[in-house]
A protein has these predicted regions:
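Structural motif
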Residues: 73-78, 120-129, 174-181, 221-233, ...
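Short loop/turn segments immediately following the C-termini of beta-strands
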Residues: 71, 116-118, 169-172, 217-220, ...
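Repeated scaffold domains used in trafficking and secretory/extracellular systems
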Residues: 53-60, 95-105, 147-158, 198-206, ...
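Loop/turn-rich, solvent-exposed surfaces of beta-rich toroidal or solenoidal domains
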Residues: 197-238
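Short coil/turn segments that connect the beta-strands within blades of beta-propeller domains
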Residues: 63-64, 108-109, 161-163, 209-211, ...
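Surface-exposed loop and turn segments in beta-propeller and other repeat-based domains
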Residues: 44-46, 84-97, 138-152, 192-199, ...
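Blade-loop segments of beta-propeller domains
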Residues: 83-118
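Beta-strand-rich domains and repeat architectures in extracellular enzymes and scaffolds
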Residues: 46-72, 100
Length: 308
């Protein structure tokens, strides 16, 4: 009994240390951003709508349609958020074993996905995959460069202006200090952009108005500490990117896990996929918070106005 009690105390102590470390890291990042003048957002955001969806990972929009990714699903919605089509077996056709989709993007009715095999906070067999926007079926796969240092893929974004596909890494190591770039037309690896300072636990990425935006799961739901979005100003060479604090998500229904993002250029709106109800440990569900028996996935639609 004494040994069991001591083990429980040790587990509780380690859990508290991890929690306090996460809070401290969030505070340090926030202070660094503010000292760099990064508290000045490019836009103001006001929640206009909230829609429940059938996926917990990513969101993108084009031509009046919305696409949502789950860890192992793809779903398309119309302009009124009615279900159009769903693919519950999106991994058909792969040569390497994969089980996880992150944040997604769309360009000319083709969906761009970062696909991998993800387990216990680690990723492998990473691939850049392109799906048909109507059928949600796999069309082609980019050749992935395994020597770039990228250890995971949490999100993907298409920049038509520079013909670049950007990828993020969620794992909290050296690989998450960069964005990884591929050529939109050829699929060739173009290099990586070092982020200064590097956000932690990046979940999604999107391109808008000449900037890159990333969401970071750098809050702590246990302590109601919110997650954040950062704006990235790339250098002309795209070798480095200056990271600025864009938004603190203290306006969601309940603190949980931030995920993918997208910008609706036609409507001037910002879209955020956010999960609540489930405890997440090392990127994996580990039970539920009080009052929840399942995880709830929602897209928050924000109206945007220029801040300056």
């Amino acid at each position: 009994m004494k040994l069991l009690t001591k083990a429980n105390r040790d587990l509780r102590r380690r859990g508290n240390v991890r929690r306090y470390t996460a809070i401290l890291l969030s505070l340090i990042i926030w202070i660094l951003m503010c000292e760099c003048g990064a508290a000045d957002s490019a836009f103001r955001y006001e929640v206009a709508e909230v829609h429940p969806v059938a996926g917990r990972q990513g969101i993108c929009t084009e031509a009046g349609y919305y696409w949502v990714s789950g860890s192992g699903t793809l779903t398309k919605y119309d302009a009124d958020w009615n279900l159009v089509v769903e693919n519950t077996e999106p991994f058909d056709g792969y040569e390497l074993e994969v089980n996880h989709i992150g944040d997604i993007d769309v360009y000319h009715n083709e969906l761009y996905l970062g696909v991998e095999y993800f387990m216990d906070g680690e990723g492998k067999n990473i691939q850049v995959a392109v799906y048909d926007g109507d059928t949600l079926k796999l069309k082609r796969v980019f050749p992935f460069r395994s020597d770039t240092g990228q250890m995971e893929c949490s999100g993907i974004a298409v920049d038509p202006d520079s013909r670049t596909v950007y990828m993020t890494s969620w794992i909290d190591d050296k690989s998450s200090e960069y964005l990884y770039m591929y050529d939109l037309d050829t699929g060739d690896y173009k290099g990586k952009m070092m982020l200064n300072p590097g956000p932690k636990w990046m979940q999604g990425i999107a391109c808008y108005d000449g900037h890159l935006y990333v969401t970071s799961d750098d809050g702590d739901a246990d302590d109601l500490a919110p997650d954040h979005m950062y704006r990235i100003d790339p250098s002309q060479s795209k070798e480095t990117g200056t990271v600025l604090l864009e938004k603190t998500f203290d306006d969601v229904i309940m603190q949980g896990e931030i995920e993918g993002l997208s910008f609706d250029k036609e409507r001037g709106q910002f879209l955020l996929l956010f999960n609540r109800g489930a405890r997440i440990v090392a990127g994996m569900p580990a039970g539920f918070y009080e009052g929840y028996s399942e995880e709830i996935h929602e897209v928050f639609v924000y109206d945007m106005t220029e801040a300056n």
